[in-house]
Structures are given as C-alpha cells and as structure tokens.
Amino acid sequence: MSIIQVSPQLLNQICTHAEQAYPNECCGILMGRLAAEERKILVEIIPTENAWNQETADNFELLETNHQRLTTTERRYTIAPEALLKAQKQGRERQLSIIGIYHSHPDHTAIPSEFDRVCAWLGYSYIIVSVQQKKAADLRSWCLDQQHQFISEEIISIS
C-alpha cells in the first residue's frame, strides 16, 4: 500500500486553504521526498492560484451546454505550468521534489472525479479535501495504480 507521511500542521494548512477558497476549488503543490518505494514524506505545500479559465476549458473540450458549471473554478482546477516549473526549480535547490498535488471538492466528497483521474500522473499523491458549507469535512489521499485507476493512499501523521 502506498503511504504519505504528513505533519498535522501541513494538513491544517491544506484545509485552511480549501476553506478560504470555498466555493471554488483550491489547489497546490506537494513538495517532499521519496523515503522508499510507495512511501513519500510531505515536507511543505505550495498553495497556488486555481488557473482554470475558459481557455483551459476549451483545451479540455468541456464546453457542452449542459456542462457549463463544470467549466468554472467551482468544479475544476488547474495549476499554471509556470507555477509547477518554479516549484520544481526551488525544490531542486533544497533537495525536494514535487510528490503530488492537492485540491478541494466544494460540497462534494473527497473522492477523485473521472476528470481528476484522467488528468492525474503516475507516481504522484493527490490529496483531496471535501469542504462542506465552508468547513473542511474530510481529507483523503489517492494515487494511481498501473491501470491508471485511483487507489487510496494511507496518510500517516508525523511530528
């Protein structure tokens, strides 16, 4: 089973970001280290702007009239490539790597959507926060298996 080790402080920062972004999805980058096969250590988070916009939606061909709501930051997120590149460069200087992405699901469960699955990268952790009526209600981590399906990833609290 895949494991991600996270401090309570970082989990709290992720939940706070999710609550502040409500009713929109928040997103950010998980920086850390690979401790062993299928074990990651989260060292810091980098909150990012949700860069989802009409152009992004066009690129994902989501503009059917019955899916208008899915083209907003209330139901979709993306991180600008520049933010990912900057995080990668800063991490390299500190012997850290991008180990995953976090985002929120406003008024939905902390379970990945099909869109989340299709856009996910193998080897990354995906922490999802369910925010119900402006309060973080649940937080779970996921990763892809070899068949590109999400499987639950155990979160171990570290000090």
Language model features: what each stretch is:
Residues 1-98, 107-159:
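Conserved beta-strand-loop surface patch within small alpha/beta domains used
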Residues 104:
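Residue-level "edge-of-site" marker
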